[in-house]
Swiss-Prot record:
Chief localisation class: cytoplasm
A single BP term in Gene Ontology: cell division
Domain of life: Bacteria
UniProt organism field: Acidithiobacillus ferrooxidans (strain ATCC 23270 / DSM 14882 / CIP 104768 / NCIMB 8455)
Binding site for UDP-N-acetyl-alpha-D-glucosamine: R93, D305, I327
Residues annotated with 2-(S-cysteinyl)pyruvic acid O-phosphothioketal modification: C117
Protein residues bound to phosphoenolpyruvate: K22, N23
Ribonucleoprotein in keyword set: no
Reaction it catalyzes: phosphoenolpyruvate + UDP-N-acetyl-alpha-D-glucosamine = UDP-N-acetyl-3-O-(1-carboxyvinyl)-alpha-D-glucosamine + phosphate
Protein name: UDP-N-acetylglucosamine 1-carboxyvinyltransferase
Alphabetical list of InterPro entries matching this protein: Enolpyruvate_Tfrase_dom, Enolpyruvate_Tfrase_sf, MurA_subfamily, RNA3'P_cycl/enolpyr_Trfase_a/b, UDP_GlcNAc_COvinyl_MurA
Purpose of the protein: Cell wall formation. Adds enolpyruvyl to UDP-N-acetylglucosamine.
């Protein structure tokens, strides 16, 4: 199992290209199952979750062609199976996203209940009740969601809670339903807008994506298309925090400041100078970060996927802060690991009080989920001495070549590969 070894060594400096968004690429890949022709996706990041999704699409029968560095063409015409098996689905939450497309396009689907980051119970009731409202018969048996419908029928659905992948699944399913579907209380994340753009390029008729009411006029079929996925706002935010924590000066390219306004506001509150261009963000930090309170909530509020990174920054900030996690009930697993590095954090329920310390000290720590892992990398960048992070397979789910990108900015970080599995 690979590990990361870091030594805190001062400010990050330089330029970096941001990858395409994992959480946009995954639904777009699932959406290819809806088409009658090949769909080409560009700006796809090299990540373990993407590889898993491509394996899943191949298992269903789709022909997957990886062209060049960042392009992937999926030909859904040879799809012959509607079963998404446990072995593939267990590692990745987003695999539930094939449910809506398979059902809408093939009339049935069997998808193992998904895994993913262990940050809470993460039910899929919003997905299932929405598909039922569209006319599907759904049962959950032997760990599989089994769904059937000759043709879905458009209807008005008020989602019981704001769910990102729930909105995406219903949006995809509704594109091929008969008549109009109105999704109310929809999630407004940029990745949903991106998915709607991809589906529209395939011939879907969608309005309102990015607002809480999305209208979809069902069509008989979707055709081939080409779509480039949005930049990864969470990767962007993670590198911005890295620069802020190390007192650095970096410029991120091929990103979009409009996707992470709440994060940029918090960085400015912490004392960073942030300058944005058409597809660039430059951050300069000339002081010790000021502690900032953070409260996670659905977009456009502060993202839960940036909570752990800001907690890491608050650990070395001037003053105290309160970090409140309102989305997931178990997303403070980084607290005990940050404490091993000398952080002063008191977590109780959904709130953590962080008192900034002058310095962290390196220690062996364990990654527990994707963004928790990122927070440990950030802490390792400023800790005195060596930080050794174990179980970084979580990190590989969501960050493309993180050690190469940070090294290019001057960080002392290297991957220690161990071919012997310690399971
Ligand atoms: C692949 C992907 O895009 N993952 C993102 C997506 O996850 P995901 O789509 O799984 O997250 P949701 O938006 O569905 O979850 C939000 C909250 O609603 C709850 N809930 C959700 C569905 C449901 O049927 N019942 C229910 O109770 C969840 O347990 C959670 O407490 O959005 C999260 C919230 O921004 C992000 O952290 C994840 O990175
Ligand atoms: C929680 C995340 O991923 P997933 O929903 O795929 O588990 C994430 O991207 O931070």
């Amino acid at each position: 199992m690979d590990k990361l070894l870091l030594r805190g060594n001062g400010p990050l400096r330089g330029e970096l290209r941001i990858s395409g968004a994992k959480n946009a690429a995954l639904p777009c890949l699932a959406a290819t199952l809806l088409a009658r022709e090949p769909v080409r996706l560009c700006n796809i990041p090299h990540l373990r979750d993407i590889t898993t999704t491509l394996e899943l699409l191949s298992t269903l029968g789709a022909r997957v062609l990886v062209d060049g560095q960042l392009g992937i063409e999926v030909d859904p015409r040879p799809v012959h199976s509607v079963v998404a098996p446990y072995e593939l689905v267990k590692t990745m939450r987003a695999s539930i996203l094939v449910l809506g497309p398979l059902l809408a396009r093939h009339g049935s689907a069997e998808v193992s209940l998904p895994g993913g980051c262990a940050i809470g119970s993460r039910p899929v009731s919003v997905h299932l009740s929405g598909l039922q409202a569209l006319g599907a018969e759904i049962t959950v048996e032997d760990g599989f969601v089994k769904a059937q419908a000759a043709r879905l029928r458009g209807t008005r659905i008020v989602m019981e809670m704001v769910s990102v992948t729930g909105t995406e699944n219903l949006l995809m399913a509704a594109t091929l339903a008969e008549g109009r579907t109105i999704l109310e209380n929809a999630a407004r994340e940029p990745e949903i807008v991106d998915l709607a753009r991809c589906l529209s390029a395939m011939g879907a008729r969608i309005s309102g994506a990015g607002t809480s009411v999305i209208e979809i006029e069902g069509v008989a079929e979707l055709h081939g298309a080409e779509h480039s996925v949005v930049p990864d706002r969470i990767e962007t935010g993670t590198y911005l925090v890295a620069a802020a924590m190390t007192g650095g000066d970096i410029c991120l390219k091929r990103t979009d400041a409009g996707l992470l306004e709440s994060v940029l506001l918090k960085l400015k509150e912490a004392g960073a100078e942030v300058t944005t261009g058409a597809d660039t963000i430059r951050i300069r930090m000339k002081r010790r970060p000021r502690a900032v309170d953070v409260r996670t909530a659905p977009f456009p509020a502060f993202p839960t996927d940036m909570q752990a990174q800001f907690m890491a920054m608050n650990c070395i900030a001037e003053g105290s802060s309160v970090v409140t996690e309102t989305i997931f009930e178990n997303r403070f697993m980084h607290v005990s690991e940050l404490q091993r590095l000398g952080a002063d954090i008191n977590a109780d329920g959904k709130t953590a009080v962080v008192r900034g310390v002058q310095r962290l000290r390196g220690a062996p720590v364990m990654a527990t989920d994707l963004r928790a892992s990122a927070s440990l990398v950030l802490a390792g960048l400023v800790a005195e001495g060596e930080t050794l992070i174990d179980r970084i397979y979580h990190l590989d789910r969501g960050y493309e070549v993180i050690e190469e990108k940070l090294s290019a900015l001057g960080a002392d970080i290297r991957r220690i590969s161990n071919t012997r599995s310690v399971a």
